[in-house]
Structure formats: C-alpha cells, structure tokens
Amino acid sequence: MEAFEHYVTVGRRRLRCGYTTGTCAAAATLGAATLLLTGEALPAARIATPSGLEVPVELTRYDAGPGWAECAVRKDAGDDPDVTDGAYVYARVSRTEGGVAVDGGVGVGRVTRAGLDQPVGAAAINRVPRRMIEEQARAAMRAAGYGGGLAVVVSIPEGVRLAERTFNPRLGIEGGISVLGTSGIVRPMSEEALVASIALELRVQRAAGVRDLLVAPGNYGRDFAAGELGLDAGRCVQCSNYVGQTIDAAAQAGFGSMLVVGSLGKLVKVAAGIMNTHSRVADGRRETLAAHAALQGASRDLVGELMRSVTTDEALPLLERAGILRETMASVTAALGDQLRRRAAGALDVEAVVFSPGWGVLGETEGASHLLALLRRAAAGEGGVRPGASMDDGAGPDDASGEKDVRPWAAGGEGPRGLRGEL
C-alpha cells in the first residue's frame, strides 16, 4: 500500500509526519460503513484531512454481524514519540433511522470535568475528529445510495492501558484515551501541540474556579514552590520554555493573576525580553546578568568573569564576593517584572519569584508577595487541581540552574492536550 510520506524539519533532523487518532477513526468509519452498506471490504482509503493533505490509510481487521460492521486502522505516528503509535483504532457502524451519531466504546475516555473540548459525560472524541468521522460516514452513505442513518462507536482496545501513561486522568478524562487532532496530521515534536497542551491545562483550572495561577518552567520550579514557598504543587502548571505564550493563554482563559516561580537560569532570559527560553531560540543569560551587574558598579574584570561563566549559578559567588549580589538581583527582577507586565498588557497581573537551588530565593518582582499570600491561602484551603508534571524543554546543558524539564512524551503521548504532535 502507498505510504504516507510527508516530512518536517526539526532542528537539523528530517522527520516523517504521521496521522492522528481522529484520522484513524475517520478511515475506520469509512471502511466499516462501506462494508455494512455494500458488502465491500476496502483494502485502503485516502482521507482528506483539515490540513489539506490526503492521507493513504490501510483498512484492516474487518468483522460484521447482523446490522453492523467493523473496521480497524493501525495508528502511524510517523517519527513522533507517541504513546498510541501502533495501536488499533476501531469503528463499529450500525444502521439507525436517520442522522449520524458518534460515540466512544472500550478504551475511549469519558469526560468528567468541565473545561475540555467535549461536555461532561461525552466520549472524549474532540470536535474535529467527530466531524471527520461524520463526513466519512456520510460519504459511504452517499456512495451506497443509503437514506437511513448510522451509529458509529469508536474503540481503542489498548486505550485503557495507554491512558495510565497519559495526563487524561488528571484532566478528568476517565476510562481511556482521547480521539484527537485538529489538522489530522501528527507533526513530530510540534511546538504548537506543546503550547496547546499548556493552554488546555489552564482552561481546566479556570473551569474549576481557580483565579490565581501558579506556573513554573519545570520540576525544579514546581518543587521549590512547594517545598520552600509553601505553595500547592498540585496546582502548578508547567510552562516549559513558553513563558510568553503561557501568559497569553492565561489572559485568554480569564485568570486574574499569575505567579511564575523559576530558576535564575530561566528567568534572566525573560528579563531580557526572551519569552521563549529554549536555548535554540536565544540565550543571553551571561550577557543579561553581566549588564545588570555593570549597572550596579561591577568592574570590567568582573564583567569579563561573568561573561566566562558557564552557568548562572557559577556567576553568583562572583557577584557575592564583589558585594553586589543583592543589588544585581534587584535589578534583574525589576527588569523581569517590566517584561512580564509588558507581555500581559494589563490583561492580568503577572509576578515572579526567582531562585537558585543552592541559594534559595534571589529576588521577587514588585507584587509577588501579594500573590504568594493568595496562593498560600489557596494551598491551605483548596488542594490542587492536578498533580504537576514536567515538560521536556530541550534546554541547554545548564539552562542555567538545572531547570531542565523531563516530560516523558514517549510515555505520555496523549498529554494534557493530547498527542505531542497531533494538530
């Protein structure tokens, strides 16, 4: 059968795209409906996806009985480290009096919490895949000249097991994985999918009534917030490198405030206006720290030493010996506050706490103490919305104080939004 050969370049790598669980379900629906209505078992199908690409899909594992037929598609995630890669997505189609009804069966989760794509009680088959499934069912009906209706039940037998390796239970999706995809295509290591997963976590918290948001780039920030600041790690949303986009998403979700707890190695970049802290986007840690030290009277020799520091933690003793550590950190956090407020543009209050694992709190933005008090009260009285979970940020060797996040995407492809690259 013809293979799906569509590639993207990520860094210096050429990676093959795959297709989403939604595309699999739509193709399986076409196969099952065609078998039910005409008796023909199609060996393959070409599915038009919302991305504009047509995907060739092999149809397999046919079965039929009185009034129903079933077909399966084996998920191909391409080069994306997707937990559902290789899983079989089934569609069982039966005749009804009219219309097309779509539901989930074994291995497809059920929504139990507001704020997700589908209402509480519905199968976790998102809007775009539902539309794709309905379109393929109707295409089979037209081709067969059938004027009645069809009921489609999508099942993923491995979904119950796979869901244990995803964030679905934390988001309020129980009993299986989600059928996802907005473009029908899995783009390996897609930044859009990572940002969308963060935005979904924010919407779930907001729907649960959370107004004051706690954010950290990764595990270190989350653990510091809980262990040193007395905050609830269960309410911490991890933004990885996407500080600016997380602010945008928090504003869109309607939060009133947001506190970022992060290492100096991460947040010194934000103080320079770098809102995506991935090392391949920009660095500037040493330059920014050296500039603020110079503003506080650092000598030319000290500035040179700071510029030669490999990590920000290595720079801190130099500033302390020069007697300007506190002043430099105050200058950095003031600039950080300015950049956060500029990005928020008045839509919400954004503050930050800057720390180093070996040095503790290094600085706070102007309004951070007020947000800390609000979040401590929430921690004492509410409990968490969801356990924190790390997110791979692809940071450099330091990212300057060990704020290296390690979200195991290969073991959790159906993450908060869903599959890592499913768009």
Name each model feature, range by range.
Residues V8, R16, L171-I177, T182-S331, ...:
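A structural signal for small-residue-enriched, beta-sheet-centric alpha/beta enzyme cores
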Residues R130, T333-G384, G388, G418-L423:
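Extended hydrophobic packing segments that form well-structured cores
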Residues L30, L36, T60, S183-G184, ...:
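Ubiquitous "structural anchor" signal
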Residues R142-Y146, A379-R420:
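Intrinsically disordered, low-complexity terminal tails and inter-domain linkers enriched
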Residues R113, A163, F224, K269-A271, ...:
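Generic domain-boundary/flexible-linker signal
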Residues M1-R165, P169-L171, G367:
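Generic N-terminal targeting/processing segments that precede catalytic cores or assembly contacts
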Residues Y88-Y90, E228-D232, T365-L371:
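Surface-exposed flexible segments
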